[in-house]
Amino acid sequence: MQNDAGEFVDLYVPRKCSASNRIIGAKDHASIQINIAEVDKVTGRFNSQYKTYAICGAIRRMGESDDSILRLAKNDCIVSKNF
């Protein structure tokens, strides 16, 4: 779709579940999006960067959201591998 200036705009951009790679539909009201802050290892302060994870409602219904977020954080080196 184009606006009056000729730029392409989308009304809805679907998200994908970070754990299962499923598309999160517009009517999935059980889905969540969480930002986890990256912390400087020396000072322990927030360094203005974060990782965004989206979890679909199906993963939350199964009770697997905490394990999924922990697995994703380990893969992104936010949490240590031996946690």
Swiss-Prot record:
GO BP, one annotated term: cytoplasmic translation
UniProt subcellular location: Cytoplasm, Cytosol; Cytoplasm; Rough endoplasmic reticulum
One cellular-component annotation, GO: cytosolic small ribosomal subunit
Hydrolase listed as a keyword: no
Gene Ontology molecular function, alphabetical: structural constituent of ribosome
Keywords, in A-Z order: Cytoplasm, Endoplasmic reticulum, Ribonucleoprotein, Ribosomal protein
Pfam family, one: Ribosomal_S21e
Assembly with partners or alone: Component of the 40S small ribosomal subunit.
Family, similarity comment: Belongs to the eukaryotic ribosomal protein eS21 family.
Described purpose of this protein according to its UniProt entry: Component of the small ribosomal subunit. The ribosome is a large ribonucleoprotein complex responsible for the synthesis of proteins in the cell.
Protein name per its UniProtKB record: Small ribosomal subunit protein eS21
Provenance organism: Xenopus tropicalis (Western clawed frog)
Name of the gene: rps21
